[in-house]
Amino acid sequence: MLKYSALFLYLIYVGGSESAHSRIVGGVPVAEEKVPYVVSIRMKEIHVCGGSILSESIVLTAAHCFDKSKGYSNYAVFAGSNRLSGGLKVEIQNITIHPKYIGPSDWWKNDLAVVKLKKPLNFSKSVRTVKIFPSYVPENETVYAYGWGKTIVPFFTLPNVLQKLETKALNLTACQKSWKEHVVESQLCLWTGHGTGVGLCKADSGGPVVYKGKLVGVISWVQVHCNTKKPDVAVRLSPYFENGLRKR
């Protein structure tokens, strides 16, 4: 059962925070031991989103990854592998959606979900937590996004091996030139540049955006059809953690 709870940010804190389609087109494969905190979230064994391990029983991902009409019993987390053909399946106890998340009509603001696992993960070299970066990423700094999203547009082709995208953090003013007021300070824009043909895509959603080895964002949405002419958008985690824990 999907849960909408005021305890949402507390759960994140004790852990360590068409439709929206978020691609890694033009990424490179990455070994599982390099990013042991990345998990695959699957519905009936089909990959739908990525996620990040915050504790032995908590995974952080995007709210839009879940269809509440299907119920949590059809979803599971797969950890410990960089391949969609592998991973240890862990059942989900509950899913807590950010209480202020609305969805497409609000441009996916607060697109965060906390997944609590039925059983704790057993940590190893391929299963580890990631810490949250506590402040803003400076403009034009290099960040990395990870996912199993579409790699070939327009075909629905998911890679078996986890992909890494090197991209840049774009400031809010520059991002709003593309997305206008739809993008706000609690969102993080990612930009690889015009004409690169590289970016995020469907099924990358929920995956981590990482800066200096720490989690700075959760992949949220991109331009429909994974058109790389506009910046990709993630949830920026730092506003949720300024001055310790702060509810938004």
UniProtKB/Swiss-Prot annotation:
Q: In which tissues is it expressed?
A: Expressed in salivary glands.
Its BP terms in the Gene Ontology are:
proteolysis
Cysteine pairings via disulfide bonds: C49-C65, C175-C189, C201-C226
Q: What's in the keyword line of the UniProt record?
A: Blood coagulation cascade inhibiting toxin, Disulfide bond, Hemostasis impairing toxin, Hydrolase, Protease, Secreted, Serine protease, Signal, Toxin
Pfam families, alphabetized: Trypsin
A single MF term (Gene Ontology): toxin activity
Q: Where are the catalytic residues?
A: H64, D111, S205
Q: Which PROSITE patterns does the annotation name?
A: TRYPSIN_DOM, TRYPSIN_HIS
Establish whether keyword Metal-binding is in the entry. no
Listed InterPro entries: Peptidase_S1 (IPR050430), Peptidase_S1_PA (IPR009003), Peptidase_S1_PA_chymotrypsin (IPR043504), Peptidase_S1A (IPR001314), Trypsin_dom (IPR001254), TRYPSIN_HIS (IPR018114)
Signal sequence annotation: 1-19
Localization in the cell: Secreted
Against SUPFAM superfamilies, the record matches this protein to: Trypsin-like serine proteases
What's its EC? 3.4.21.-
Q: Which SMART domains match?
A: Tryp_SPc
Where does it sit, as one GO cellular component term?
Answer: extracellular region
Main enzyme class: hydrolase
Q: Which Gene3D superfamilies does this UniProt record tie to the protein?
A: Trypsin-like serine proteases (2.40.10.10)
Write out the transmembrane intervals: none
Q: What does this protein do?
A: Serine protease that inhibits blood coagulation in a dose-dependent manner. May act by destroying coagulant factors to inhibit blood coagulation.
Question: What family does the database annotate?
Answer: Belongs to the peptidase S1 family.
Q: What is this protein called?
A: Tabserin
